[in-house]
Amino acid sequence: MYNYLLIRYGEIGLKGKNRSYFEKSLVKNMQSALKDLEIGKIKSTQGRMYIPLSGSSDELTRVLDRVTRVFGIETVSPAVKVESDLEVIKKTALQVFKNHMDSISPQNQVSFKVDCRRADKLFSKNSMEMNQILGAHILDHVPGLKVDVKQPQILLQVEIREDGTYIFTEKIPGHGGLPIGTTGKGVLMLSGGIDSPVAGWLAMKRGIQVVGLHFHSYPFTSQRALKKVEDISQVLSRYGTGPTGGFKLITNHFTDIQKAIQNYCSESMWVTVMRRFMFYIANRMAQKEQAMTVVTGENVGQVASQTLESMHAVSQDVVNLPILRPLAGLDKKEIMSKAETIGTYDISIRPYEDCCTLFLPKNPKTRPSLEQTKREISKLNFEELVEESLEKTEIKYFEPYQDITEEELTFDV
């Protein structure tokens, strides 16, 4: 039934002189998300974007699932576009209204409201007149209705524009934010836990093109632990659709570094020294990727390694880029809820431990000093261990919609 998808954006509309750059980026990202579907050209006009549809419900389901994951979009509406003729508008508005009625299967009397906006000033009727005409037409043809202008169960919206009239009843929320790629590139320190995927998602929401960096310690950590991270990367790829598409995961083989730390460093400092190595490698990877930031899933005070003293000790002097910690102000419950929304939670709780979990000492140092950390690292051949680790790096790309099943689609239209 629906032949267009209306796209509304929020923050992009406030960008002033740079607005066109953000709008073009949003269009490119939507095109990237829909590249394997036979979709017509996306149009942009008068603060709206329009995606043409064939009218197939299967197509609408797929397009909605993908478009609502693209950052920068505030809401979307499946709409029927018709010529701006009064009788055609009346007939179509009634069809759209009945279609929505059928989808909600009301048990009691239904309240409704018509909200018409006339952007085309050459149209013969004004907005108020159209509200009255369409409201009366619906009341005449659908029994058991009542008008409620404050809290209607069904809001029929009509936009009369220069290129035609758009009729719809739904505003489906997107995730807002900024189009990916508009604010730069970052390297995400990605574990298999709950936190780091959410941190990466939040960085993406602010327009950052994220590259994942995972530290793998085979055989201490299993291939199933790595598969867990790859599955998380697959989920993130569906949100990370920027102009280049997909999600890039860099896997750094960290085993030899962890062995050296375990053999030569004080047990209470294992985590601190290990994380300092990780930050140094992340900084090197960021430089190689021409990224401008390192993103982590650290929170403040959530675990022993996340005190302010510890954060200072693990990153000071080894990272010369901004470090983003999007979760710093969130409670664990909030992070878990967001992980469920994103779709990474069920993957993250699989019982396969990552390299940080396996090497936890009995009594970790919670407030290590930078000097103490440097003394521990001086026991190791830091540069040699790092270079050997970098030589064992692997890269894998994840396409956002490869092998997607019907059950994974979000919308049932």
Curated annotation (Swiss-Prot):
Domain of life per record: Bacteria
A GO term for molecular function: ATP binding
Domain called THUMP: residue spans: 61-171
InterPro entries given in the database record: Rossmann-like_a/b/a_fold (IPR014729), ThiI_AANH (IPR020536), ThiI_fer (IPR054173), ThiI_N (IPR049961), THUMP_dom (IPR004114), THUMP_ThiI (IPR049962), tRNA_STrfase (IPR003720), tRNA_sulfurtransferase_ThiI (IPR050102)
Binding site for ATP: M189, L190, H214, F215, R275, G297, Q306
Location(s) in or outside the cell: Cytoplasm
Keyword ATP-binding in record: yes
EC number: 2.8.1.4
GO CC, any one term: cytosol
Catalytic activity entry: [ThiI sulfur-carrier protein]-S-sulfanyl-L-cysteine + a uridine in tRNA + 2 reduced [2Fe-2S]-[ferredoxin] + ATP + H(+) = [ThiI sulfur-carrier protein]-L-cysteine + a 4-thiouridine in tRNA + 2 oxidized [2Fe-2S]-[ferredoxin] + AMP + diphosphate; [ThiS sulfur-carrier protein]-C-terminal Gly-Gly-AMP + S-sulfanyl-L-cysteinyl-[cysteine desulfurase] + AH2 = [ThiS sulfur-carrier protein]-C-terminal-Gly-aminoethanethioate + L-cysteinyl-[cysteine desulfurase] + A + AMP + 2 H(+)
Sequence similarity: Belongs to the ThiI family.
NCBIfam families: tRNA uracil 4-sulfurtransferase ThiI (TIGR00342)
Annotated protein name in UniProt: Probable tRNA sulfurtransferase
Gene name in the database record: thiI
